[in-house]
């Protein structure tokens, strides 16, 4: 990385005005007097985005809106990537493998210092929830756009975060108070809680190190597998045991908190549609959460945030059972993949808020100012082949047609000729639809998926077309096992959702 490594304007990689653009989507509108006046008093002038792909582009766009300069970092595999073209400046950080580039703290910090960045935005994934990275930023005079390193270490440990929720008086799923030491202790808690149980990694998320266990024999097989998977993914193989909630929904609350003790919640997101414990489709508001339950869950989320001394943007996640009782499961100390649905619902630019809060500014609004309008649904577009057990589908994008029209937002890193690499998470974009109600959002999303043409790599677009055609989804009759059951169903998807939408139930309104 020595010779040839230099600080260069991103325009070296092409005229920004001619770079493939995603500006035809539905942009969030800043509140009057906010985004356009912030730059007059900003302590931050240049932000290094410690990420890649669509989330790097999202942060760079926020920088543009705020009149700030941005620095993209890139690996050898991402030299021609779209986020490199979008940024004010670009800086190489290593080889194609993530451990040699985006996960290499020394190289990322070297890039920040070399480019004279004031702050680092971590996006999601990679180093976004790495407390050591946040601490290094703090120690080296860089503003980390996120919670403090101490807070991140607390909520990043699921066992400690669970105890934090208990101390705050928020209900948690019954389980072991600490990670279990061995299989014998796991059996002890399984006997105490009763099957089914969940094995969960004490660190990390995304479904890694998680197993549903139905009996003693399965526990013997699953414990070692879950622990090994967690160790490989997070460098921490500790496992704790929870009682499994039967047919739950996964509902999360978006929070914002400043360093002056002010907090707000921005309502919930429904994240129940998951494949192998990983979210694939999110929506807001949840079709089963009424204003009373929303307020209760929002208050609980802020109680956890207060107990953890949380600041900046974060998400408090809950399981919701069939009796509408909710249980804390974890805190995500970063911007979520699914943040656009909240932005479309509230009109609040979450990335701009993160940048403001990271400078020690007070929240620019109060809870009473938060309004929810309409309904938004997001599909995560992965370069995976649904017909081949969702195997990764790297390759060159030969043809690309991006959907548009009323209520459609596309957050993507694709362009014709882009070579989708094999080295990273296969998410290449997010397609979001907004409507006055859930039915309108569903119809708009179905239209947009039909318009979305990607040739050269396989994507999960056919999966979402199938989901949107399913009457159980349309009528909001699903739980966290819904998608896996749908995928196991040999029936073919229908060509139209018209008939199902005409009979949609009140729960979608």
Indicate where each model-derived feature is located.
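Catalytic cores of soluble metabolic enzymes centered on carboxylation/carboxyl-transfer
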Residues: 301, 340-509
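Short, positively charged and aromatic/hydrophobic N-terminal segments
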Residues: 22-23, 34
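N-terminal beta-alpha lobe that positions the nucleotide/phosphoryl donor
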Residues: 34-316, 320-339
